[in-house]
Amino acid sequence: MEQFRNVGIIGRLGSTRVLETVRRLKRFLIDRHLHVILEDTIADVLPGHGLQTSSRKMLGEVCDLVIVVGGDGSMLGAARALARHKVPVLGINRGSLGFLTDIRPDELELKVAQVLEGQYLTENRFLLEAEVRRQGEAIGQGDALNDVVLHPGKSTRMIEFELYIDGQFVCSQKADGLIVATPTGSTAYALSAGGPIMHPKLDAIVVVPMYPHTLSSRPIVVDGNSELKVVVSPDMTIYPQVSCDGQNHFTCAPGDTLHVAKKAQKLRLIHPLDHNYYEVCRTKLGWGSRLGGHD
């Protein structure tokens, strides 16, 4: 197991609970004689912290562990910035669901200490890279840990598009949009649109139409190495939006093509040893508990 000596902290802004947890975490790490580096945005709201600061991008270069304090949205943003550096990332939940940030604030010291002592699990989560092309030229690019979504933006009209997978025509469709999700993102927007839950170790991508104008349209699970192309109908009069993790956005024009494929670099996600994916699903999604009388 790796020994962590340079630990970066990223915190969600605008939350007093996050600031309180960041302060606790900072003190705990300093007491263990670790070199602590704060992301510059959270450092700005912690006057007198007395620590080295860094941009989020640079944290990946100077740290051998980054701890994210916030919710899943905070982890999504951190993942896109840090995946290329292969730095392990650990999450402390100060959001609502916490699929990715799985350490509770009340167990911060215990669980972080275990991780620092080498008692942890590592998961490699792949990201998607999206590119919009206009007449063959790239006009917008973005990465996503959860999903790439084609949607009508502020318009209430349906989108007409064609879907190709690995160069093969799949279908033409009218729908409110299309979600292309990783296994990580299968419990997010894709789930609410009727997609399946995929275990994060699966090397697969799910394609989920949003309110399609045909009853036979269903989600498709494809190989994780597939290359997807979505052609926006040239006859459309609206300009659809592409969103990566609901955080990065760019605009398509009629006739543009959206290309989505697996990104080469993966997120190294750290969990405590007692992490259980099915327990997370059961807790976060409200699944039924075990029947009495069974071992």
Curated annotation (Swiss-Prot):
Binding site residues for NAD(+): D72, G73, N146, D147, R157, K174, D176, T187, A188, Y189, A190, L191, S192, Q247
Major subcellular location class: cytoplasm
Root EC class: transferase
Stored Gene3D superfamilies: Probable inorganic polyphosphate/atp-NAD kinase, domain 1 (3.40.50.10330), Probable inorganic polyphosphate/atp-NAD kinase, domain 2 (2.60.200.30)
Cofactor: a divalent metal cation
Disulphide bridges, residue numbers: none
InterPro entries membership: ATP-NAD_kinase_N (IPR017438), ATP-NAD_kinase_PpnK-typ_C (IPR017437), NAD/diacylglycerol_kinase_sf (IPR016064), NADK (IPR002504)
HAMAP family (alphabetical): NAD_kinase
Protein's recorded name: NAD kinase
Source taxonomy: Bacteria, Pseudomonadati, Pseudomonadota, Gammaproteobacteria, Pseudomonadales
